[in-house]
Structure formats: C-alpha cells, structure tokens
C-alpha cells in the first residue's frame, strides 16, 4: 500500500473552488496526510485524505451557501486528483443529511451496503464512487 497525500497544487485547486463558489477566504491545514480546508469565518469546510492508494475519503463537508455547485465542482476536482495519482475510489464518509444523500444519488455515488442503515428518511453511512480506470 502506497501512502499518498494531496500536493500543494491540488490543495490550492480545491481551496480556489471553495473560495470562488462560497465567496470566502480559506486556509488549509495538513496533518498526517489529512487536508482540512476551512474558511476564515469557519462556515465552510472540507476534509479529505487518502487511504493508501485504495481510496480518497471525504470525511467532512459543510458549505454556508447552498445550491451554488460547490460540492459538484469539488467532486469533479477530486475525480481529477484521483486520476492523477491512480486512486480508483472516492468515499463520502458518514452521510447524515437528506441533502448529502440527494447529492450522492444525483452524482451516482452509491451507498455502501456494509456501512449504511436507514434512519428515518435518510440512508446514513458511507457512500462510494468507483472511478473509471
């Protein structure tokens, strides 16, 4: 298993998307291979990391302004990053809201049958997207 981390350029691309779509200023913190991008007002955040060369994990997402295409643009960038480093899978960890469930469904991101359960109207848990090789 190869240990991967986002490059400074990849982090800057993600940061630029969030700043542009959310009209904010962000900073990125890197710790043990995990990248956490937050806005100065702490209303926007994205946390991503690699699990070796197996998958890229999105473990935290929060954007102040909805329906601006922020997560769609972030997902497209994450797909490019995975292609650059040869990672075949993106995992959206701990989907808890109807909005994120709807986003995953619209983007063909599938619930992991081993880690999801029905909680009211939301199928909570991890969702994954297998990428073309």
Predicted regions and their residues:
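Conserved acetyl-CoA-binding loop-helix of GNAT-fold acetyltransferases
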Residues: 67-80
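Conserved hydrophobic beta-strand within the GNAT/NAT acetyltransferase core sheet
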Residues: 90-94
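Glycine-rich phosphate/pyrophosphate-binding loop shared by adenosine-nucleotide-utilizing enzymes
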Residues: 39-46, 56
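C-terminal "cap" of GNAT-fold acetyltransferases
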Residues: 116-133
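Conserved acetyl-CoA binding element of GNAT-fold acetyltransferases
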Residues: 51-64
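Conserved active-site alpha-helix within GNAT-family acetyltransferase domains
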Residues: 84, 95-118
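Short amphipathic alpha-helix that is part of the acyltransferase structural core
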Residues: 1-29
């Amino acid at each position: 298993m190869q240990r991967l981390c986002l490059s400074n350029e990849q982090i800057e691309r993600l940061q630029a998307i969030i700043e542009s779509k959310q009209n904010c200023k962000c900073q990125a913190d890197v710790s043990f291979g995990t990248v956490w991008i937050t806005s100065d007002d702490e209303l926007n955040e994205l946390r991503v990391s690699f699990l070796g060369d197996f998958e890229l994990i999105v473990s935290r997402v929060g954007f102040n302004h909805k329906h601006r295409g922020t997560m769609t643009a972030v997902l497209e960038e994450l797909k490019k990053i995975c292609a650059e480093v040869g990672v075949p899978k993106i995992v959206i960890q701990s989907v808890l809201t109807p909005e994120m469930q709807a986003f995953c469904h619209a983007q063909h991101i599938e619930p992991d049958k081993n880690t999801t359960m029905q909680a009211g109207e939301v199928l909570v848990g991890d969702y994954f997207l297998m990428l073309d090789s």
